[in-house]
A protein has these predicted regions:
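Histidine-acidic metal/acid-base catalytic patches
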Residues: 1-106
Length: 106
């Protein structure tokens, strides 16, 4: 939706009743909260349609592996993070998205 749509919130609202699985990530492929996606707008739109399906983070920050090769990740966007640091980034992003979702429910 980020690339194809003029207004992501409206696109989400138009998908009401059809949206069954929502993948999230930043425009720069990093975890949510480390880019410039309009998370307030996105979470408000999901709240507006009462979306209660899966929300799955899909950051692609390290080259290598089958997925990294398939999507052509050619540089390390993690800052050289090890597995523990990657886990910490994922936990931070989860807290960020949960907070944005909570704020959107108000």
């Amino acid at each position: 939706m980020n690339i194809e749509e003029d207004h992501i919130g409206d696109a989400i609202r138009q998908s009401a009743g059809y949206l069954g699985h929502f993948h999230i990530g930043e425009c720069n492929r990093k975890v949510p909260g480390r880019g410039h996606m309009p998370w307030d707008e996105i979470m408000r739109a999901l709240a507006d349609i009462r979306y209660d399906g899966a929300v799955v983070m899909e950051p692609f920050v390290k080259p290598g592996g089958q997925v990294g090769q398939d999507i052509k990740v050619f540089r390390d966007l993690s800052g050289g993070a090890d597995e523990a640091q990657m886990d910490a980034m994922a936990a931070e992003a989860l807290r960020f998205i949960r907070q944005k979702s909570k704020e959107a429910q108000k």
